[in-house]
Amino acid sequence: MSVEKTNQSWGGRFSEPVDAFVARFTASVDFDKRLYRHDIMGSIAHATMLAKVGVLSDAERDAIVDGLQQIQAEIEAGSFDWRVDLEDVHMNIEARLTDRIGVTGKKLHTGRSRNDQVATDIRLWLRDEIDTILAEITRLQEGLLGLAEAEADTIMPGFTHLQTAQPVTFGHHLLAWFEMLGRDYERLVDCRKRVNRMPLGSAALAGTTYPIQREITCQLLGFDAVGGNSLDGVSDRDFAIEFCAAASLAMMHLSRFSEELVLWTSAQFQFIDLPDRFCTGSSIMPQKKNPDVPELVRGKSGRVFGALTGLLTLMKGQPLAYNKDNQEDKEPLFDAADTLRDSLRAFADMVPAIRPRREIMREAARRGFSTATDLADYLVRKGLPFRDCHEIVGHAVKYGVDSGKDLAEMSLDELRRFSEQIDADVFDVLTLEGSVNARDHIGGTAPNQVRAAVARGRQLLAQR
């Protein structure tokens, strides 16, 4: 029986070519071609191992390696012809290799399946992405440390429920983001450990009958360990899900930070100014200067959250081992990594350029009875129970609201209406400086604690 020849590597079983629409629908080359560098890296390592175990001759290995390197140069020069009829990045590269070096190119796939090939490619790619993202987190943290050190004495209101709560230093506030990003860094480092396990050698699902030595390819590709089960190696994408979970947490932190920057740049706050290069204007309102970078980062967080949900949904119903569903793992993973990396880059560039408006911050901290807790603590030190002190200060605050006076603006006689325990030394704790300086412990907002935290932060970054 005569059968029309197809370009697919698996066409021998079939009696007719794939429908043209189905071929386009099932092809992944339009998005997985970004894996080309890691696909070639894996193939070179695989060919090197096959030569060491005698499956390929040294001459065949050299021809394959040279051909793959030339193909990489073609791709990077923009002259490579990506073909949808060849489905994916793997078969496009293999077909071009065979075009270049002949029948030897067909030997490259010996002892390997696209199932373990793509799992290896994704892990290699994600490992590199994590390393880039970690570097951007560090760069952003360095910027936060520099700004926090410069603003260690700058007083601003701290908020709960977006209402004035207690005075803090701007430097202390910035260091909160440093801490959160530090945990994001740790999560990604930990995630990388599980990404960096090699599935290559799992073949389709059960391993291979060839005398492969997986330790060789593991070492050549820089993996920490060989995967212990071939079914697991080709079928699970928990490492990608874990990355998206860590990326979602990082984007959540950036989104919250973005919200603060948007508020602080508004006319209602005016706490900070962003350089023009990080803002845009309005097509109709000439006066507008919009904080587009933080607004967009805030919005982009949803893309990463969506990638996490999408991957969880993708995997939840699949039996072992590989299923075509897994082709859908790449686009959300790629997008999550791109979004996090670019958001971090934008923030790492922008944060050191933030210009605080110190007097406006200070005036905002002065309003809203932000030293009320300090007055309560003062009365506790005079021997009164805290709950009684809380009520006393509450009455004083009500008086202040009615009279239009902050606590520090009241006379001693006015304050003594609420407790005879109040003496002239009370004004030492009612000042903004007195309030922040009193919180002089590790993790507190006192300026010297901010400087100490900056020093610890720099030491931490130096050890990475």
UniProtKB/Swiss-Prot annotation:
Q: What metabolic or biological pathway is this protein involved in?
A: Amino-acid biosynthesis; L-arginine biosynthesis; L-arginine from L-ornithine and carbamoyl phosphate: step 3/3
Disulfide connectivity for this sequence is none
* GO annotation terms (biological process): arginine biosynthetic process via ornithine; L-arginine biosynthetic process
Q: What is its EC number?
A: 4.3.2.1
**CC annotations in GO:** cytosol
Q: Which InterPro entries match?
A: Arg_succ_lyase_C, Argininosuccinate_lyase, Fumarase/histidase_N, Fumarate_lyase_CS, Fumarate_lyase_fam, Fumarate_lyase_N, L-Aspartase-like
Record key words, sorted: Amino-acid biosynthesis, Arginine biosynthesis, Cytoplasm, Lyase
Instruction: Tell me a Gene Ontology molecular-function term this record carries.
Output: argininosuccinate lyase activity
Where found in the cell? Cytoplasm
Q: Which reaction does it catalyse?
A: 2-(N(omega)-L-arginino)succinate = fumarate + L-arginine
Query: One Pfam family, short name please?
Result: Lyase_1
**Membership in a protein family:** Belongs to the lyase 1 family. Argininosuccinate lyase subfamily.
Record-linked NCBIfam families: argH
What's the protein here called?
A: Argininosuccinate lyase
Q: What species was this sequence derived from?
A: Pseudomonas aeruginosa (strain UCBPP-PA14)
